[in-house]
């Protein structure tokens, strides 16, 4: 795995070590648009809540396509904007609009195809994610604060505000695709198959 934030990499590696996966998982600090790996290094790849922080989706997906073997599957699970409503900040991935790079699922698909991926399927995960954040918010309110373990550890002291803003954004008519949308594509560079 790769992350731009050194603290996330070191924490992730410690967590892998704690659960006995340290020898099977390697995390690297670096730029996801210029990764330090050889062409065709990976049999598959996935991206989980990354694209909302990277404005240059075309560069990102071209880099992933370079790194995976032909025919490899690439899964994406990101927050994608589907409406024109303004978003209240902070949100889980960004404290301010200038560090947020939300894009539509159409933009993701175009960038994936331009990079050499063929879309296998796209699935709207709005309801799943909305329920998760609503339940997280309810638990935080019921418990009078943060539980011992939870998303607040990664989100910091403003976790309750970020979660509140995501719940509110998801209540807007079709403003966000799921809070997350999953996209699966492969690096075959042949015809496009789409099923939504």
Segments (PLM) and residue ranges:
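A short acidic, Gly/Pro-enriched loop at the edge of an enzyme's catalytic core
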Residues: 33-45
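A short glycine-rich, Lys/Arg-flanked "PGG" loop and its adjoining helix->strand segment in the class I
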Residues: 58-73
